[in-house]
Curated annotation (Swiss-Prot):
PROSITE patterns: IF_ROD_1, IF_ROD_2. This is Keratin, type II cuticular Hb1. One of its GO terms (molecular function) is structural constituent of skin epidermis. It comes from Homo sapiens (Human). Residues 106-417 form the IF rod domain. SMART domains: Filament (SM01391). GO terms for cellular component: cytosol; extracellular space; keratin filament. It is linked to Monilethrix: A disorder clinically characterized by alopecia and follicular papules. Affected hairs have uniform elliptical nodes of normal thickness and intermittent constrictions, internodes at which the hair easily breaks. Usually only the scalp is involved, but in severe forms, the secondary sexual hair, eyebrows, eyelashes, and nails may also be affected.
Length: 505
Protein backbone atom coordinates (compact mmCIF):
# COMPACT_ATOMS: atom_id res chain seq x y z
CA UNK A 1 0.00 0.00 0.00
CA UNK A 2 1.30 3.44 -0.86
CA UNK A 3 0.49 6.28 1.49
CA UNK A 4 1.11 9.93 0.63
CA UNK A 5 1.85 12.52 3.30
CA UNK A 6 2.80 16.17 3.56
CA UNK A 7 6.40 15.58 4.69
CA UNK A 8 8.27 17.76 2.24
CA UNK A 9 6.25 16.47 -0.71
CA UNK A 10 7.86 12.99 -0.53
CA UNK A 11 5.95 9.67 -0.74
CA UNK A 12 6.71 6.45 1.10
CA UNK A 13 5.08 3.09 1.72
CA UNK A 14 4.31 1.35 4.93
CA UNK A 15 2.51 -1.75 6.09
CA UNK A 16 0.41 0.00 8.67
CA UNK A 17 0.51 3.53 9.91
CA UNK A 18 -1.19 5.01 12.87
CA UNK A 19 -0.07 8.34 14.14
CA UNK A 20 -0.91 11.93 14.13
CA UNK A 21 -1.52 13.92 11.03
CA UNK A 22 1.53 14.85 9.05
CA UNK A 23 3.25 17.77 10.71
CA UNK A 24 6.46 18.75 12.29
CA UNK A 25 8.08 18.52 15.67
CA UNK A 26 8.24 21.97 17.20
CA UNK A 27 9.69 22.98 20.52
CA UNK A 28 9.22 26.63 21.35
CA UNK A 29 9.96 28.80 24.32
CA UNK A 30 9.35 32.32 25.52
CA UNK A 31 12.79 33.10 26.97
CA UNK A 32 14.21 36.14 28.69
CA UNK A 33 13.77 39.52 26.94
CA UNK A 34 11.47 38.15 24.24
CA UNK A 35 14.04 36.09 22.29
CA UNK A 36 12.48 33.16 20.52
CA UNK A 37 13.73 30.05 18.83
CA UNK A 38 11.93 27.79 16.40
CA UNK A 39 12.83 24.50 14.89
CA UNK A 40 10.74 22.52 12.45
CA UNK A 41 11.54 19.11 11.03
CA UNK A 42 9.82 17.46 8.16
CA UNK A 43 10.34 14.12 6.63
CA UNK A 44 8.88 10.68 6.18
CA UNK A 45 9.61 7.21 7.47
CA UNK A 46 8.30 3.67 7.14
CA UNK A 47 7.66 1.02 9.79
CA UNK A 48 5.40 -1.89 10.54
CA UNK A 49 3.56 -0.21 13.40
CA UNK A 50 3.76 3.37 14.38
CA UNK A 51 1.75 4.89 17.16
CA UNK A 52 2.41 8.51 17.77
CA UNK A 53 0.97 11.25 19.89
CA UNK A 54 1.98 14.10 21.98
CA UNK A 55 1.55 15.38 25.43
CA UNK A 56 2.61 18.82 26.46
CA UNK A 57 3.43 20.07 29.91
CA UNK A 58 4.56 23.40 31.22
CA UNK A 59 6.35 24.57 34.29
CA UNK A 60 6.66 28.16 35.33
CA UNK A 61 5.46 31.22 33.44
CA UNK A 62 5.97 32.17 29.81
CA UNK A 63 7.18 28.69 28.75
CA UNK A 64 5.33 26.18 26.64
CA UNK A 65 6.57 23.26 24.60
CA UNK A 66 4.70 21.09 22.12
CA UNK A 67 5.64 18.23 19.89
CA UNK A 68 3.53 16.55 17.34
CA UNK A 69 4.61 13.92 14.97
CA UNK A 70 8.24 13.01 15.20
CA UNK A 71 9.63 12.02 11.87
CA UNK A 72 12.91 10.59 10.84
CA UNK A 73 14.60 10.13 7.52
CA UNK A 74 13.48 7.33 5.30
CA UNK A 75 15.65 4.31 4.71
CA UNK A 76 17.89 4.56 1.75
CA UNK A 77 16.09 1.71 0.04
CA UNK A 78 12.29 1.07 0.17
CA UNK A 79 11.07 -2.39 -0.89
CA UNK A 80 7.56 -3.55 -1.69
CA UNK A 81 5.71 -4.91 1.30
CA UNK A 82 2.39 -6.62 1.79
CA UNK A 83 -0.50 -4.79 3.35
CA UNK A 84 -2.55 -6.11 6.21
CA UNK A 85 -6.18 -5.27 5.37
CA UNK A 86 -7.21 -5.37 8.99
CA UNK A 87 -4.99 -2.48 9.63
CA UNK A 88 -6.91 -0.30 7.14
CA UNK A 89 -9.75 0.20 9.54
CA UNK A 90 -9.89 3.64 11.12
CA UNK A 91 -8.07 3.88 14.38
CA UNK A 92 -8.88 6.10 17.30
CA UNK A 93 -5.65 7.99 17.63
CA UNK A 94 -6.96 10.36 20.33
CA UNK A 95 -5.63 13.41 18.52
CA UNK A 96 -6.76 16.76 19.77
CA UNK A 97 -8.90 18.46 17.05
CA UNK A 98 -7.59 21.87 18.15
CA UNK A 99 -3.97 20.94 17.49
CA UNK A 100 -3.89 22.91 14.23
CA UNK A 101 -5.21 26.03 15.97
CA UNK A 102 -2.67 25.59 18.72
CA UNK A 103 0.09 25.23 16.13
CA UNK A 104 -1.13 28.39 14.38
CA UNK A 105 -1.09 30.22 17.68
CA UNK A 106 2.39 28.90 18.31
CA UNK A 107 3.46 30.19 14.89
CA UNK A 108 2.06 33.64 15.68
CA UNK A 109 3.72 33.58 19.07
CA UNK A 110 7.02 32.60 17.48
CA UNK A 111 6.63 35.43 14.96
CA UNK A 112 5.93 37.91 17.75
CA UNK A 113 8.91 36.60 19.69
CA UNK A 114 11.09 36.90 16.61
CA UNK A 115 9.83 40.48 16.20
CA UNK A 116 10.69 41.17 19.81
CA UNK A 117 14.10 39.62 19.27
CA UNK A 118 14.64 41.92 16.27
CA UNK A 119 13.44 44.85 18.37
CA UNK A 120 15.93 43.91 21.06
CA UNK A 121 18.68 43.75 18.46
CA UNK A 122 17.67 47.22 17.27
CA UNK A 123 17.66 48.37 20.87
CA UNK A 124 21.16 46.95 21.35
CA UNK A 125 22.33 48.82 18.27
CA UNK A 126 20.65 51.99 19.52
CA UNK A 127 22.34 51.55 22.89
CA UNK A 128 25.67 51.12 21.13
CA UNK A 129 25.00 54.35 19.22
CA UNK A 130 24.07 56.05 22.50
CA UNK A 131 27.29 54.71 23.99
CA UNK A 132 29.28 56.20 21.10
CA UNK A 133 27.36 59.46 21.50
CA UNK A 134 28.12 59.55 25.23
CA UNK A 135 31.79 58.86 24.55
CA UNK A 136 31.80 61.72 22.02
CA UNK A 137 30.10 64.02 24.54
CA UNK A 138 32.61 62.95 27.19
CA UNK A 139 35.50 63.77 24.85
CA UNK A 140 33.86 67.10 23.97
CA UNK A 141 33.30 68.02 27.62
CA UNK A 142 36.88 67.04 28.48
CA UNK A 143 38.21 69.27 25.68
CA UNK A 144 35.79 72.01 26.72
CA UNK A 145 36.97 71.75 30.29
CA UNK A 146 40.56 72.14 29.10
CA UNK A 147 39.55 75.21 27.10
CA UNK A 148 37.65 76.77 29.99
CA UNK A 149 40.66 76.49 32.31
CA UNK A 150 42.20 79.54 30.54
CA UNK A 151 39.42 81.94 31.63
CA UNK A 152 40.85 82.80 35.02
CA UNK A 153 44.23 84.16 33.71
CA UNK A 154 42.35 86.24 31.13
CA UNK A 155 40.13 87.77 33.81
CA UNK A 156 43.17 88.38 36.04
CA UNK A 157 44.99 90.10 33.16
CA UNK A 158 41.95 92.25 32.40
CA UNK A 159 41.58 93.18 36.07
CA UNK A 160 45.30 94.02 36.26
CA UNK A 161 44.94 96.26 33.18
CA UNK A 162 41.98 98.04 34.77
CA UNK A 163 43.97 98.48 37.97
CA UNK A 164 46.87 100.03 36.04
CA UNK A 165 44.43 102.37 34.31
CA UNK A 166 42.96 103.27 37.70
CA UNK A 167 46.47 103.99 39.01
CA UNK A 168 47.17 106.16 35.96
CA UNK A 169 43.91 108.00 36.55
CA UNK A 170 44.83 108.47 40.22
CA UNK A 171 48.25 109.83 39.18
CA UNK A 172 46.56 112.15 36.68
CA UNK A 173 44.10 113.26 39.34
CA UNK A 174 47.02 114.01 41.68
CA UNK A 175 48.80 115.96 38.94
CA UNK A 176 45.61 117.83 38.12
CA UNK A 177 45.10 118.53 41.83
CA UNK A 178 48.64 119.98 42.04
CA UNK A 179 47.98 122.04 38.93
CA UNK A 180 44.72 123.19 40.46
CA UNK A 181 46.55 124.24 43.61
CA UNK A 182 49.12 126.10 41.51
CA UNK A 183 46.37 127.81 39.53
CA UNK A 184 44.62 128.69 42.77
CA UNK A 185 47.86 130.20 44.08
CA UNK A 186 48.24 132.17 40.84
CA UNK A 187 44.63 133.22 41.17
CA UNK A 188 45.27 134.37 44.73
CA UNK A 189 48.23 136.40 43.45
CA UNK A 190 46.11 137.94 40.76
CA UNK A 191 43.43 138.66 43.32
CA UNK A 192 45.98 140.42 45.47
CA UNK A 193 47.18 142.38 42.45
CA UNK A 194 43.59 143.21 41.61
CA UNK A 195 42.98 144.40 45.14
CA UNK A 196 46.15 146.51 44.96
CA UNK A 197 45.03 147.94 41.63
CA UNK A 198 41.61 148.65 43.10
CA UNK A 199 43.25 150.43 46.02
CA UNK A 200 45.49 152.35 43.59
CA UNK A 201 42.43 153.23 41.58
CA UNK A 202 40.71 154.49 44.70
CA UNK A 203 43.80 156.53 45.54
CA UNK A 204 43.90 157.91 41.97
CA UNK A 205 40.22 158.74 42.18
CA UNK A 206 40.84 160.52 45.46
CA UNK A 207 43.71 162.43 43.88
CA UNK A 208 41.48 163.20 40.92
CA UNK A 209 38.81 164.54 43.25
CA UNK A 210 41.39 166.65 45.09
CA UNK A 211 42.83 167.93 41.81
CA UNK A 212 39.32 168.64 40.63
CA UNK A 213 38.75 170.64 43.75
CA UNK A 214 41.98 172.58 43.07
CA UNK A 215 40.89 173.14 39.46
CA UNK A 216 37.53 174.34 40.70
CA UNK A 217 39.25 176.71 43.09
CA UNK A 218 41.49 177.99 40.28
CA UNK A 219 38.49 178.37 38.05
CA UNK A 220 36.69 180.30 40.76
CA UNK A 221 39.73 182.50 41.21
CA UNK A 222 39.84 183.02 37.48
CA UNK A 223 36.16 183.95 37.53
CA UNK A 224 36.76 186.34 40.41
CA UNK A 225 39.67 187.91 38.59
CA UNK A 226 37.63 188.26 35.44
CA UNK A 227 34.84 189.87 37.48
CA UNK A 228 37.40 192.21 39.08
CA UNK A 229 38.77 193.09 35.64
CA UNK A 230 35.31 193.89 34.38
CA UNK A 231 34.60 195.97 37.48
CA UNK A 232 37.85 197.85 37.01
CA UNK A 233 37.10 198.42 33.36
CA UNK A 234 33.67 199.78 34.27
CA UNK A 235 35.23 201.96 36.94
CA UNK A 236 37.79 203.23 34.44
CA UNK A 237 35.02 204.01 32.00
CA UNK A 238 33.09 205.80 34.72
CA UNK A 239 36.09 207.83 35.75
CA UNK A 240 36.78 208.67 32.12
CA UNK A 241 33.25 209.86 31.59
CA UNK A 242 33.41 211.76 34.86
CA UNK A 243 36.63 213.40 33.85
CA UNK A 244 35.20 214.34 30.49
CA UNK A 245 32.11 215.88 32.17
CA UNK A 246 34.26 217.84 34.53
CA UNK A 247 36.35 219.06 31.64
CA UNK A 248 33.23 220.08 29.83
CA UNK A 249 31.91 221.91 32.87
CA UNK A 250 35.20 223.63 33.38
CA UNK A 251 35.37 224.60 29.76
CA UNK A 252 31.85 226.05 29.96
CA UNK A 253 32.85 228.07 33.05
CA UNK A 254 35.99 229.39 31.50
CA UNK A 255 34.68 229.89 28.02
CA UNK A 256 33.83 233.50 28.70
CA UNK A 257 37.09 234.17 30.42
CA UNK A 258 40.34 234.28 28.66
CA UNK A 259 43.12 233.79 30.97
CA UNK A 260 46.51 232.93 29.92
CA UNK A 261 48.25 230.96 32.51
CA UNK A 262 51.53 229.48 31.97
CA UNK A 263 52.04 226.32 33.96
CA UNK A 264 54.83 223.99 34.29
CA UNK A 265 54.07 221.00 32.14
CA UNK A 266 56.05 218.83 34.34
CA UNK A 267 53.49 219.24 37.07
CA UNK A 268 50.54 218.35 34.88
CA UNK A 269 48.68 215.13 35.80
CA UNK A 270 48.44 212.85 32.78
CA UNK A 271 45.49 210.70 33.64
CA UNK A 272 45.46 208.90 30.33
CA UNK A 273 48.93 207.65 30.84
CA UNK A 274 48.17 206.65 34.36
CA UNK A 275 45.01 204.85 33.33
CA UNK A 276 46.82 203.29 30.42
CA UNK A 277 49.58 202.11 32.67
CA UNK A 278 47.15 200.73 35.25
CA UNK A 279 45.14 199.11 32.52
CA UNK A 280 48.29 197.67 31.01
CA UNK A 281 49.34 196.37 34.41
CA UNK A 282 45.97 194.80 35.06
CA UNK A 283 45.86 193.38 31.55
CA UNK A 284 49.28 191.90 32.05
CA UNK A 285 48.26 190.45 35.40
CA UNK A 286 45.05 189.04 33.95
CA UNK A 287 46.88 187.66 30.95
CA UNK A 288 49.54 186.04 33.11
CA UNK A 289 46.97 184.65 35.52
CA UNK A 290 44.85 183.37 32.72
CA UNK A 291 47.83 181.78 30.98
CA UNK A 292 49.06 180.27 34.22
CA UNK A 293 45.59 178.98 35.10
CA UNK A 294 45.03 177.62 31.64
CA UNK A 295 48.46 175.98 31.48
CA UNK A 296 48.05 174.54 34.97
CA UNK A 297 44.53 173.40 34.14
CA UNK A 298 45.68 171.87 30.84
CA UNK A 299 48.61 170.14 32.51
CA UNK A 300 46.41 168.80 35.28
CA UNK A 301 43.79 167.70 32.74
CA UNK A 302 46.43 166.02 30.61
CA UNK A 303 47.92 164.38 33.65
CA UNK A 304 44.49 163.24 34.83
CA UNK A 305 43.61 161.99 31.35
CA UNK A 306 46.89 160.05 31.16
CA UNK A 307 46.31 158.68 34.65
CA UNK A 308 42.75 157.71 33.76
CA UNK A 309 43.89 156.11 30.50
CA UNK A 310 46.68 154.27 32.29
CA UNK A 311 44.42 153.08 35.08
CA UNK A 312 41.69 152.17 32.55
CA UNK A 313 44.21 150.14 30.55
CA UNK A 314 45.45 148.48 33.71
CA UNK A 315 41.88 147.82 34.78
CA UNK A 316 41.05 146.39 31.37
CA UNK A 317 44.10 144.11 31.45
CA UNK A 318 43.24 143.10 34.99
CA UNK A 319 39.67 142.31 33.96
CA UNK A 320 40.92 140.30 30.99
CA UNK A 321 43.33 138.42 33.23
CA UNK A 322 40.54 137.84 35.75
CA UNK A 323 38.24 136.57 32.99
CA UNK A 324 41.02 134.37 31.63
CA UNK A 325 41.69 133.05 35.11
CA UNK A 326 37.98 132.44 35.63
CA UNK A 327 37.82 130.55 32.35
CA UNK A 328 40.93 128.58 33.32
CA UNK A 329 39.42 127.86 36.74
CA UNK A 330 36.20 126.69 35.12
CA UNK A 331 38.12 124.55 32.64
CA UNK A 332 40.31 123.06 35.34
CA UNK A 333 37.26 122.52 37.55
CA UNK A 334 35.52 120.77 34.66
CA UNK A 335 38.65 118.69 34.03
CA UNK A 336 38.86 117.82 37.72
CA UNK A 337 35.18 116.88 37.77
CA UNK A 338 35.65 114.87 34.58
CA UNK A 339 38.69 113.16 36.07
CA UNK A 340 36.73 112.42 39.24
CA UNK A 341 33.82 111.05 37.18
CA UNK A 342 36.21 108.99 35.05
CA UNK A 343 37.95 107.76 38.17
CA UNK A 344 34.62 106.79 39.74
CA UNK A 345 33.56 105.13 36.47
CA UNK A 346 36.84 103.23 36.28
CA UNK A 347 36.50 102.19 39.91
CA UNK A 348 32.93 101.07 39.21
CA UNK A 349 34.14 99.27 36.06
CA UNK A 350 36.92 97.59 38.06
CA UNK A 351 34.42 96.56 40.74
CA UNK A 352 31.95 95.39 38.10
CA UNK A 353 34.70 93.53 36.25
CA UNK A 354 35.76 91.89 39.49
CA UNK A 355 32.14 90.96 40.21
CA UNK A 356 31.67 89.70 36.65
CA UNK A 357 34.93 87.80 36.90
CA UNK A 358 33.86 86.25 40.19
CA UNK A 359 30.43 85.49 38.74
CA UNK A 360 32.01 84.02 35.60
CA UNK A 361 34.43 81.96 37.69
CA UNK A 362 31.61 80.75 39.94
CA UNK A 363 29.49 80.03 36.87
CA UNK A 364 32.40 78.20 35.29
CA UNK A 365 32.93 76.24 38.50
CA UNK A 366 29.19 75.42 38.64
CA UNK A 367 29.23 74.39 35.00
CA UNK A 368 32.37 72.36 35.64
CA UNK A 369 30.66 70.67 38.58
CA UNK A 370 27.54 70.10 36.43
CA UNK A 371 29.69 68.69 33.64
CA UNK A 372 31.52 66.47 36.09
CA UNK A 373 28.15 65.33 37.47
CA UNK A 374 26.86 64.81 33.94
CA UNK A 375 30.06 62.95 33.09
CA UNK A 376 29.69 60.80 36.19
CA UNK A 377 26.02 60.20 35.35
CA UNK A 378 26.97 59.41 31.76
CA UNK A 379 29.59 56.97 33.04
CA UNK A 380 26.98 55.38 35.32
CA UNK A 381 24.46 55.25 32.47
CA UNK A 382 27.12 53.81 30.20
CA UNK A 383 27.99 51.23 32.87
CA UNK A 384 24.28 50.37 33.23
CA UNK A 385 23.94 50.14 29.46
CA UNK A 386 27.04 47.97 29.29
CA UNK A 387 25.62 45.73 32.03
CA UNK A 388 22.28 45.54 30.21
CA UNK A 389 24.12 44.89 26.98
CA UNK A 390 26.12 42.12 28.64
CA UNK A 391 22.92 40.69 30.11
CA UNK A 392 21.27 40.82 26.69
CA UNK A 393 24.34 39.23 25.12
CA UNK A 394 24.39 36.57 27.84
CA UNK A 395 20.70 35.93 27.22
CA UNK A 396 21.37 35.82 23.49
CA UNK A 397 24.26 33.43 24.07
CA UNK A 398 22.05 31.24 26.26
CA UNK A 399 19.30 31.30 23.64
CA UNK A 400 21.79 30.46 20.89
CA UNK A 401 22.95 27.55 23.02
CA UNK A 402 19.30 26.57 23.55
CA UNK A 403 18.68 26.67 19.83
CA UNK A 404 21.76 24.56 19.15
CA UNK A 405 20.76 22.21 21.95
CA UNK A 406 17.22 21.87 20.60
CA UNK A 407 18.59 21.26 17.13
CA UNK A 408 20.91 18.49 18.33
CA UNK A 409 18.16 17.09 20.55
CA UNK A 410 15.64 16.98 17.72
CA UNK A 411 18.17 15.50 15.33
CA UNK A 412 19.10 12.83 17.90
CA UNK A 413 15.47 12.08 18.74
CA UNK A 414 14.58 11.91 15.09
CA UNK A 415 17.35 9.40 14.54
CA UNK A 416 16.27 7.37 17.56
CA UNK A 417 12.62 7.35 16.44
CA UNK A 418 13.69 6.21 13.02
CA UNK A 419 15.68 3.39 14.64
CA UNK A 420 12.52 2.31 16.55
CA UNK A 421 13.62 3.04 20.08
CA UNK A 422 10.84 3.26 22.64
CA UNK A 423 10.09 5.97 25.12
CA UNK A 424 11.87 9.27 24.88
CA UNK A 425 12.07 11.54 27.90
CA UNK A 426 12.53 15.26 27.08
CA UNK A 427 13.47 17.76 29.80
CA UNK A 428 13.81 21.48 29.09
CA UNK A 429 14.80 23.98 31.77
CA UNK A 430 15.52 27.66 31.84
CA UNK A 431 16.77 30.05 34.48
CA UNK A 432 13.84 32.39 33.81
CA UNK A 433 11.07 29.78 34.08
CA UNK A 434 10.22 26.23 34.96
CA UNK A 435 11.11 22.94 33.30
CA UNK A 436 8.97 20.94 30.94
CA UNK A 437 9.67 17.27 30.54
CA UNK A 438 7.79 15.17 28.07
CA UNK A 439 7.92 11.41 27.32
CA UNK A 440 7.65 10.63 23.66
CA UNK A 441 6.65 7.05 23.08
CA UNK A 442 6.80 5.34 19.76
CA UNK A 443 5.36 1.81 20.00
CA UNK A 444 2.62 -0.32 18.65
CA UNK A 445 -0.32 0.76 20.83
CA UNK A 446 1.08 2.50 23.88
CA UNK A 447 -0.36 6.00 24.49
CA UNK A 448 1.85 9.00 24.96
CA UNK A 449 2.52 10.01 28.56
CA UNK A 450 4.41 12.94 29.93
CA UNK A 451 5.72 14.22 33.20
CA UNK A 452 6.40 17.71 34.43
CA UNK A 453 9.65 18.59 36.08
CA UNK A 454 9.71 21.73 38.17
CA UNK A 455 13.16 21.49 39.65
CA UNK A 456 15.35 24.60 39.32
CA UNK A 457 18.40 24.61 37.10
CA UNK A 458 21.70 26.41 37.56
CA UNK A 459 22.22 27.30 33.91
CA UNK A 460 20.09 29.11 31.42
CA UNK A 461 18.87 25.98 29.57
CA UNK A 462 19.16 22.31 30.26
CA UNK A 463 17.68 19.65 27.99
CA UNK A 464 17.94 15.96 28.64
CA UNK A 465 16.35 12.86 27.22
CA UNK A 466 15.50 9.70 28.93
CA UNK A 467 17.53 7.59 26.55
CA UNK A 468 21.26 7.14 26.62
CA UNK A 469 22.67 6.98 23.14
CA UNK A 470 25.56 4.62 23.78
CA UNK A 471 23.81 2.17 26.03
CA UNK A 472 20.13 2.60 25.27
CA UNK A 473 19.08 2.82 28.90
CA UNK A 474 16.23 4.99 30.04
CA UNK A 475 16.73 8.08 32.15
CA UNK A 476 14.04 8.21 34.80
CA UNK A 477 15.49 11.06 36.82
CA UNK A 478 13.70 13.73 34.77
CA UNK A 479 10.35 12.17 35.52
CA UNK A 480 11.12 12.57 39.16
CA UNK A 481 11.70 16.28 38.76
CA UNK A 482 15.47 16.79 38.21
CA UNK A 483 17.45 17.83 35.14
CA UNK A 484 21.03 17.37 34.16
CA UNK A 485 23.01 20.61 34.12
CA UNK A 486 26.47 20.93 32.64
CA UNK A 487 29.42 22.24 34.53
CA UNK A 488 29.58 25.35 32.34
CA UNK A 489 26.64 26.89 34.19
CA UNK A 490 24.97 28.22 31.03
CA UNK A 491 23.20 25.31 29.34
CA UNK A 492 23.65 21.60 28.99
CA UNK A 493 22.15 18.67 27.18
CA UNK A 494 22.06 15.41 28.98
CA UNK A 495 21.16 12.28 27.07
CA UNK A 496 20.56 9.30 29.27
CA UNK A 497 21.50 8.80 32.87
CA UNK A 498 23.29 5.50 32.83
CA UNK A 499 26.56 7.07 33.87
CA UNK A 500 28.77 10.11 33.70
CA UNK A 501 30.57 8.74 30.65
CA UNK A 502 27.46 8.95 28.44
CA UNK A 503 26.32 12.50 29.36
CA UNK A 504 26.75 15.10 26.63
CA UNK A 505 27.04 18.77 27.43
Amino acid sequence: MTCGSGFGGRAFSCISACGPRPGRCCITAAPYRGISCYRGLTGGFGSHSVCGGFRAGSCGRSFGYRSGGVCGPSPPCITTVSVNESLLTPLNLEIDPNAQCVKQEEKEQIKSLNSRFAAFIDKVRFLEQQNKLLETKLQFYQNRECCQSNLEPLFEGYIETLRREAECVEADSGRLASELNHVQEVLEGYKKKYEEEVSLRATAENEFVALKKDVDCAYLRKSDLEANVEALIQEIDFLRRLYEEEILILQSHISDTSVVVKLDNSRDLNMDCIIAEIKAQYDDIVTRSRAEAESWYRSKCEEMKATVIRHGETLRRTKEEINELNRMIQRLTAEVENAKCQNSKLEAAVAQSEQQGEAALSDARCKLAELEGALQKAKQDMACLIREYQEVMNSKLGLDIEIATYRRLLEGEEQRLCEGIGAVNVCVSSSRGGVVCGDLCVSGSRPVTGSVCSAPCNGNVAVSTGLCAPCGQLNTTCGGGSCGVGSCGISSLGVGSCGSSCRKC
